[in-house]
Amino acid sequence: MSRYRGPRLRLIRRLKDLPGLTNKTLKSKKAQIAIDQSASKKISQYCIRLEAKQRLRFNHGLTERQLLKYVRIAGKAKGSTGQVLLQLLEMRLDNILFRLGMSPTIPAARQLVNHRHILVNNRLVDIPSYRCKPKDIISVRDQTNSQILVKKNLESLNKDQIPEHLTFSSLEDNKPQGFVNRIVTRDSIGLDINELLVVEYYSRKA
């Protein structure tokens, strides 16, 4: 299953806010009433688990196969499968760029990486799924177009919104740079999600 490329507001109406996918929100009262009415209807446990899975998948811009791969990796790791799953997704390079404010959305961050604008520890990385580690330094290529792209995104940055596992700074030459302090904790996850529902969805399909 490929990545979703349709209208993003349609997804928000169905799955509620997806900050990684879009910074748009439903502002009209009619749309909000429709969501509230649908939420009040009795739905099956399967549909609840499916919605949680879809929220996680669409927020991070993953295909079904990619998300299933992460679930399997998390299942083999020590600790809570759900929390490990969220950590794996949060520590992806495209998500780190988004959480640092270097891009407005995760799809936009993916393009920055694919177009070779991003460095990790002063080395060019063009793989959005690259797994960042503590002490990694995220920076932008020393090229005019790369710097302009990221600095434009940073104009609306609220540093108070940067999670505790990351640090953002501007160097003396005003070049943006991010630092990974540690592995993300559950409290700093960027999406309101019940990860256990996602794990249950896949465990019942296995």
Swiss-Prot record:
Residues 91-159 form the S4 RNA-binding domain. The keyword Ubl conjugation does not apply. CDD domains: S4. It is found in: Plastid, Chloroplast. Its main location: plastid. GO terms for cellular component: chloroplast; small ribosomal subunit. Keywords: Chloroplast, Plastid, Ribonucleoprotein, Ribosomal protein, RNA-binding, rRNA-binding. GO terms for biological process: ribosomal small subunit biogenesis; translation. One of its GO terms (molecular function) is rRNA binding. Pfam families: Ribosomal_S4 (PF00163), S4 (PF01479). InterPro entries: Ribosomal_uS4, Ribosomal_uS4_bac-type, Ribosomal_uS4_CS, Ribosomal_uS4_N, S4_RNA-bd, S4_RNA-bd_sf. NCBIfam families: PRK05327.1 (NF003717), rpsD_bact (TIGR01017). Part of the 30S ribosomal subunit. Contacts protein S5. The interaction surface between S4 and S5 is involved in control of translational fidelity. One of the primary rRNA binding proteins, it binds directly to 16S rRNA where it nucleates assembly of the body of the 30S subunit. With S5 and S12 plays an important role in translational accuracy. Belongs to the universal ribosomal protein uS4 family. This is Small ribosomal subunit protein uS4c. It comes from Angiopteris evecta (Mule's foot fern).
